[in-house]
Amino acid sequence: MTKQRVRIFVKGKVQGVFFRQALKVKAIQHGILGWVKNLNDGRVEAVLEGDIEKVNILVEWCHAGSANSRVEDVEIRNEKFTNEFSNFDVLY
């Protein structure tokens, strides 16, 4: 399968609404590796690596967000696949 790596920035009401935790659950369900963290400007940043179809599922989920979030914008940057991760972490 084709592998993909993306870095995403999610803007909106995405902090304090369990967005990172929900993304981690989805990532684990789909076998995606990487990390997610809050940024000081109120956005959430994540790096996702895995099968292209599964990464795309998570990117689409980020447009909808967790139950209490309100996503305004999702910026997606394609990056070179590195296979550097062994799990999916919430960074603090």
What are these regions (language model features)?
Residues 1-92:
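Intrinsically disordered, low-complexity, mixed-charge
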